[in-house]
């Protein structure tokens, strides 16, 4: 797999130990997204405080996450902000809105927009990320058109070839690390890490180890036959790291 910059989402399932975080750092993770609040939980701040403290002590970049079922956008935003402020997160911190729509929510898109509106009062829209499972998109619980394209999009699609969504800026590729339940992701464009791995504004892409014609076509939204034709290549041709691939 291509060596993109990595992020880790931590929550109540994540081991609360310095040793575990050191293992994450050794694996190449230096950006941690700490779940500060979760719908239906009033005491989540204690867990968030421990994870925030450990990550900061190890000089990891710390970002914030709100896990929501979209049932009560105002309550979710208010509780999130109280923890956000208490733990010293500030304007400019990246914030992930993790959407797990409750089945009783009649209009998930409307409530998501309401929640994003509340959060935008204290988080710049350029620092907001909407995270959602690929399954919810496939089932139509939420559609890509429901998520404004000026927000980063994180797609949770573990154990697959790629994010499965061309627009994805971050892809959660696994749910496990060191035999623990742990969401890890590739940060394609450096939204969290500040390290972009793609020449998105250029007509060419510099191939990295593990790239294939399929992954490049999917990631850049290029029709595979067209990509092959532009590069005078065949589907079975191997890609060499450092090779320059024409995108348009």
Say what each PLM segment does.
Residues 98-102, 127-138:
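Acidic/histidine-rich, metal-coordinating catalytic segments
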Residues 65-67, 204-210, 230:
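Solvent-exposed beta-strand motifs enriched in subsets of small alpha/beta binding domains
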Residues 197-221, 243:
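Primarily a LysM-type cell-wall glycan-binding module
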Residues 56, 164, 218:
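Anion (oxyanion) recognition and catalysis
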Residues 34, 64, 130-132, 155, ...:
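Structural beta-sheet core signal
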Residues 1-12, 24-26, 138-201:
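Functionally critical loop-and-helix segments that line ligand-binding/catalytic clefts
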Residues 1-121, 125:
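Substrate-binding cleft of extracellular glycoside hydrolase catalytic domains
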Residues 215-218, 222-248:
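Extracellular LysM carbohydrate-binding repeats and other cell-envelope/extracellular binding modules
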């Amino acid at each position: 797999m291509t060596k993109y910059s990595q992020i880790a989402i931590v929550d109540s399932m994540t081991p609360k130990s310095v040793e575990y975080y050191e293992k994450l750092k050794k694996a190449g993770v230096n950006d941690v997204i700490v779940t500060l609040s979760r719908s239906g939980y009033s005491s989540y701040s204690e867990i968030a405080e421990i994870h925030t403290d450990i990550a900061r002590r190890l000089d990891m970049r710390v970002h914030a996450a709100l896990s929501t079922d979209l049932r009560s956008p105002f309550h979710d935003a208010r509780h999130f902000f109280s923890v956000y402020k208490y733990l010293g997160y500030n304007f400019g911190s990246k914030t992930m809105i993790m959407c797990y729509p409750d089945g009783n929510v009649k209009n998930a898109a409307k409530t998501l927009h309401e929640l994003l509106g509340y959060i935008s009062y204290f988080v710049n829209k350029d620092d907001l990320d909407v995270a959602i499972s690929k399954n919810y998109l496939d089932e139509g619980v939420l559609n890509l058109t429901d998520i404004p394209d000026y927000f980063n999009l994180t797609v949770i699609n573990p154990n697959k070839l790629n994010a499965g969504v061309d627009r994805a800026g971050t892809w959660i590729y696994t749910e496990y690390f060191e035999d623990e339940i742990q969401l890890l992701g590739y940060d394609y464009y450096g939204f969290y890490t500040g390290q972009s791995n793609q020449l998105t504004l250029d007509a060419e892409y510099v191939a990295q180890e593990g790239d294939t014609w399929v992954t490049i076509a999917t990631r850049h939204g290029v029709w595979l036959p067209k990509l092959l034709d532009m590069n005078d290549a065949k589907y079975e041709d191997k890609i060499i790291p450092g090779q320059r691939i024409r995108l348009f």
